[in-house]
Amino acid sequence: MPNFSSQSTSGDQSHILMIRMDNAKIISHILKAINFKENSVFCCTKDGLKVTVEDMKSVQLNAFIEPVVFQSYVIKEEEIKFQLNLTVLLECLNVFGSNNLQSGTSPALKLYYNGHGTPVSILLEESGVITDCKIRTVHFDPVLDYDFGSANVIGRIIMSSECLKEVFCELDSTSDTVQFSLSPDSANFRITTFGHSGTYHVDIPKESDVIETLHCTSAVSFKYKLTLMKPSIKPLGIAQKVSLRIDDTGLVCFQFMIKVEDNHNCYIDFYCPADVDFEEDE
């Protein structure tokens, strides 16, 4: 198995962040699912790595990778933040080929960062061949910090991600919005579009095998711009399970659970606000 454990030097002491993993495809697999915009903000703490991509200060994707997923995760400051081009990072991570977790060999990764103004350095090794990449970082633009406290949640569903992906892929593309509806008295989770050919409903029964939990404290019915929901399709494609929560303002959060090696899980959160224009028109 390739690794860099024998290549540590005294230079490692200058790094404020150092990550090592035996299978770089894991991080590539997760980050590819949130790559709908180029700029990404990395936030590293003792709890792990969080990578945020957002658009128009509204829709947002966050990938979370806990320290246990890495072979080594060393951080020398309480919090480290920087911004870099995610597309460039993925090109570096995939320099040896496909990022498919099930195919081919797995390159080893070592990533380190020395602080503000310095590049992120990446070493990849596969079959004795080592590639050294450096990616320029910039001062990060502040991202929205969505406060999704449990007290504000009025609807929550845990269900199969495969089922939700199938529904999303078949939504009427002529519809500007998609509506999520559920209520304490309803036996279904309803997804509705409003296209040129009319209104189209998909009802997923509460008692079906694909729904694990459906809890609702009051009637929920909010619309979302279909174009803003599209970035959720990639995480749906690699997740085993999804938790959907809606708060009293209509903010929806999808949390995708993604299984990786050694029975560890990584998570991706997707946030999208309700379409206020449509809510006001009703």
Predicted regions and their residues:
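DNA polymerase sliding clamps and clamp-related checkpoint/processivity subunits
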Residues: 1-173, 179-282
